[in-house]
Amino acid sequence: NNTYLIVDAAAGVQSSNSQSQSIANWGAGPNAPDWITGISSSGLSSITAGAFIRAVADHYSTTPVAQLTTAYDGAQRYFYNVGLLIDSNKSYVASSSMWGSSNGYDVADSNSCDWKSTMESYRSTAAGAANYRSFTAPGDLHVLTTGSRFFETTGSDSVVLSDWINLMLAGSGSWTSENCTSCSPPVTAQSSPSTLSCP
């Protein structure tokens, strides 16, 4: 039997306190895969998602590891901003004027370029594992493996996601990372035009 790991829409970009609070509140520490070098229950609150995926991929070196996201994933950016607002100790306001809408564009204090650049940094860290590949599509959709998205989303070389996954399953040498470059903030059914200009 072959094993494959697909990480979909989980770049792991969080505000400075969100990760440690989540680990503590959810009691995740005792469940850390501490048999993997570089991962420990005490270190879960500080390890980056990129380092975590790299450690898992290195440990299971014969398992292909694929990470999928969009360059401006609206749901991930929204919750990143929620973490920033919580970290700032702002007074709570029960209004979208504080939290913004879930598409991640009109969030009052959002810094989406930070989310994108950190996602790319984590992706680069994970790419240190020989069995890791990434697929970063343009746009702001959250979760790419559901419904028609799986058969319609394309990467940097116009490779369709479903075909890319099939290359992984076939063990093809053509299975390479497909990351869009110079992706502008999108205009899609889930978003509105943005004035963001991220490199």
Which sequence ranges carry the predicted segments?
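C-terminal His-loop and adjacent cap/lid subdomain of alpha/beta-hydrolase
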Residues: 1-199
